[in-house]
Amino acid sequence: MARQEQQQHLQVLSALDAAKTQWYHFTAIVVAGMGFFTDAYDLFCISLVTKLLGRIYYTDLAKENPGSLPPNVAAAVNGVAFCGTLAGQLFFGWLGDKLGRKSVYGMTLLMMVICSIASGLSFSHTPTSVMATLCFFRFWLGFGIGGDYPLSATIMSEYANKKTRGAFIAAVFAMQGFGILAGGIVTLIISSAFRAGFPAPAYQDDRAGSTVRQADYVWRIILMLGAMPALLTYYWRMKMPETARYTALVAKNAKQAAADMSKVLQVEIQEEQDKLEQMVTRNSSSFGLFSRQFARRHGLHLVGTATTWFLLDIAFYSQNLFQKDIFTSINWIPKAKTMSALEEVFRIARAQTLIALCGTVPGYWFTVFLIDIVGRFAIQLLGFFMMTVFMLGLAVPYHHWTTKGNHIGFVVMYAFTFFFANFGPNSTTFIVPAEIFPARLRSTCHGISAAAGKAGAIIGSFGFLYAAQDPHKPDAGYKPGIGVRNSLFVLAGCNLLGFICTFLVPESKGKSLEEMSGEAEDDDDEVAAAGGGAAVRPQTA
């Protein structure tokens, strides 16, 4: 089978698989990665400013505590971008297979730039109108962000060589960690600058004066700055040629694929149009997504990539979105009434930046350095297992962690759950769908898997706003929930299910994309391929 694949393989694809790491690889990582930097910044920075939005637009000076967003508004502001992302992943994933990766790639970036700026310009003076406008633009921001998931992963996988493909895709995704970190740092800088320029007393000392008028600029500037990295990389994204695998295997233009990659790799590559036509004639397996052939060859794989991403994102996004409430519950952030509005923003940003620096960013880069050594399967299993362990380690002795003197231990344990999410399923669930499906369906299947993940993120962001409420003392406007401790038990259960579902996902380390997808096989080999899941399944002995 290996010899047959070698005979059928186009020279342009073999050249890409065997290429040494070159400058164009790093260029592709930066160009694609800046999209993820922007994605993470835009999606996570909203959790830093929700408390500020509540103070500005929903404070009742007759009440003892500063205002907070009503439950339905908080759920919408936190979760609406995820709804847009889910829709964008499905739409642009499908479009990337129909029109080509490059032609769709610029659309997503422009949407991110325009909607990031528009989010900060949300107009009107009534709270309802401002929040409605903000949610409208954040939905379309999420729609653009959604397209970046399948397109960036697919482009990087189709550009990369076989030996270090996992590290290259992981490096693109790792820019998400820097985006989260940047969101925290930018918020720290802006809140510090405004706090120094417009000092204000704590809410309990001066209810009206604790939120200065200029605080309304703070959240707008933070959201609008998300447009900058995307804008800076637009030109370079448009200069990238279409991937050779799309041009050759989907558009059936071997001449153009060879010409494009000859420039990129700086080597002479034969056109081999005749060979491509022979391959098309010999291998007519142009089955669609909803065909029996796809179900036999890749059905369980798609179920595996979708369910693991879904379960991971329930835990991952709920942690990020209610971490400010966790910090409050362990007294890492003082009670709101003891701070001014800008002081509260500063303290929330400082806490999130510390978690990103210690737990989030290192986990991504451990994946980059180790994924092509130990494989995707082992990293994903380890990640889900350790997340389960640390979640239980937080939940079982939760009352111990919340007593005086034990708060730092809680934060360390909490940081480890983020570390093993990123040195684990948060990275691998992004990588594997870009490697195991046929070129003509690769972007679509990645989009489906990613959309399943965002469905989990929606459950996490909407559901846990309510679930994490204290059963005895819920926040104003909320019904009693199951509390942070029981929420952590639920998240541990999600991680355990993710561990089990990982066994549906094949190992792709060291294999070509065509070997994983079965595109190098004849129709005569279809039966073998249909039962060949075991051939690419990880060895667990």
From Swiss-Prot:
Residues 516-527 have a biased composition (Acidic residues). Residues 1-28, 96-102, 148-168, 237-297, 375-376, 426-447, 508-541 are cytoplasmic. GO terms for cellular component: membrane. Keywords: Membrane, Phosphate transport, Symport, Transmembrane, Transmembrane helix, Transport. Residues 514-541 are annotated as: Disordered. It is a multi-pass membrane protein. GO terms for molecular function: phosphate transmembrane transporter activity; symporter activity. It is found in: Membrane. Although related to the sugar transporter family, it does not transport sugars. This is Probable inorganic phosphate transporter 1-8. It comes from Oryza sativa subsp. japonica (Rice).
